[in-house]
Regions:
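N-terminal auxiliary segments of SAM/dcSAM-dependent transferases
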Residues: 8-104
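SAM-dependent Rossmann-like transferase core, predominantly class I methyltransferases
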Residues: 68, 78-169
Length: 169
């Protein structure tokens, strides 16, 4: 059975998460109880809650524990609850809601026009395509059927001396 986020931004402030830490806990619990699928950049409710909360709080993901006590503005709480409600009730993947996704350690703009980048090819790129390719650094690379272009752009980033073409229909 799914779980619906019933708290709205206009309800009593006593009931709403007021700090980053409270928001992380709340979002994680809601996501755990819902029937959403993880696998679009995260594989569990806590990590997805962190991405969502840090996004609305405008904090870097690599923030330390000191941010847990940081208060959230009413606007941030309203945005958080809206995103969480869409995530749970419409089952929209978080990268589509936030318009950002990570691939091969790089951040990309993301929306429903292309598949969310989550290919195992990221690990191949980061590992210089070892053990399947052991020659000199490639001079030309083609990303065919590139979609949003994340693979080709990541390859261009990690192989700066290569000429990279991205092609899609």
């Amino acid at each position: 059975m799914g779980y619906t986020c019933t708290m709205t931004a206009t309800e009593s402030s006593r009931e709403q998460p007021r700090t980053v830490g409270e928001a992380l806990q709340y979002c994680s619990e809601v996501l755990e109880k819902s029937a959403v699928h993880f696998g679009h950049g995260t594989d569990n409710a806590w990590d997805e809650a962190a991405q969502l909360v840090f996004f609305v709080a405008e904090l870097p993901l690599e923030s330390d524990d000191s941010v847990l006590r940081q208060p959230l503005s009413n606007k941030a709480v309203a945005r958080l609850l809206s995103y969480l409600d869409q995530r749970v009730t419409q089952k929209l993947p978080l990268p589509y809601l936030l318009h950002r996704a990570w691939f091969a350690g790089l951040e990309f703009c993301c929306d429903q026009r292309a598949i969310i980048p989550r290919s195992p090819i990221a690990e191949l790129i980061l590992g210089d395509f070892q053990p399947w390719y052991s020659g000199d650094s490639p001079k030309r690379i083609l990303d065919l059927c590139c979609g949003g272009g994340c693979i080709g752009l990541a390859v261009a980033h990690y192989f700066p001396d290569a000429h990279v073409d991205l092609l899609d229909i």
